[in-house]
Amino acid sequence: MKRQAWYLFLSVSLVILIVCGLSYWAFCQAMRAETNVRYSGMQSVISLQLGKTISGMEMSATNVFNEVEKHLDSPEAVIHALESESNLNPDVRGYFAAFEPNYFKEKGTWFEPYVHHTDSSKFEMTQVGSARHDYTKSPWYVRAKNIKMAFWSDPYYYYDGTNISGHYSTFVKPVFDANNNLACVCGADITFEWLGSELERINNGCRNSQQVNKYRLMRALDFYSMVLHKDGTCLIHPEDKNLPITDNKMLADLDQHNTGFVEMDVAGVPSMVFYGPIDGIDWAVAVVTPLSDLQKPFTYMAIALALLALISMIVTFVICRRI
């Protein structure tokens, strides 16, 4: 092949490589934007739906607490109010009313009736207040007494050797009598097992959504979700997928209820974590997806453009030889 043909071949090949390189760069920019929008949007939807579930729990619990407030004339009336309203939301593990010391003199210092599930359909009432369980010193009781408004307690593990032992979070609300004095602190317990099943139900809804699955772009959409406390503690996660938060920016974002994403190893798998707060509670939802799944479109497009460049250069070489 003559020198002029080589010059032509090399010039055209250079143009082909530049065009393919720019095409891949543009594709990468678009795919990164699409990935962030897709998974940030998915995280936002999961947070919103889980937040609605928690808000529904709050409304149901508030109805129970309002009934307690209407029946502060006797301890029997309080117990009846708890028992009569407990079936409104079977997902609540139990309702309690922890009264101020000697509010009912016949009940003494500690009176805390607790109406709770014994199985999937039955409730029973237990008096749990005692010198051994001095609820008046519990953080949730002290906080409710001080701030005089409803809130969610920090997650905790309760153990008493019975079937109600487990990981809990409690929606707490102070209840006042007709003279605006604190009568008791009411609470509704939810278990992390129940919340985990709700999170998985929401995840499955997202996985099977037609809108999510319409443009997979060669990805398996292999994601899962976690619930994080604002201090970085992983509250709910799939088995063997615990996420220890060590990234300072992520910890700051969780504490300040900001959204974001970060690349980190989860259970030994390089992953991308998209996180954001749940409204009304100091928790956040994190959507985790393996980097290997996110990289599939980039890998396939790089191979396709490389093959296209190679074929184009071969065709150019053949044409240049015949000139």
PLM region descriptions:
Residues 106, 136, 194-285:
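Intrinsic low-complexity, intrinsically disordered coil/linker regions enriched in small/polar
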Residues 1-33, 37-38, 305-317:
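Extreme N-terminal signal-anchor transmembrane helix of membrane signaling/transducer proteins, especially
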Residues 24-40, 46-61, 67-76, 88:
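Membrane-proximal amphipathic alpha-helices
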Residues 139, 297, 301, 319-323:
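Juxtamembrane alpha-helical signal-transduction segment immediately C-terminal to a transmembrane helix
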Residues 65-69, 82-90, 145, 203-220:
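Short regulatory alpha-helical segment in sensory/regulatory domains of signaling proteins that mediates
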Residues 164-205, 272-274, 282-293, 297:
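Conserved beta-strands of PAS-like sensory domains
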Residues 87-166, 231-249:
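Extracellular/periplasmic ligand-sensing ectodomains of membrane signal-transduction proteins
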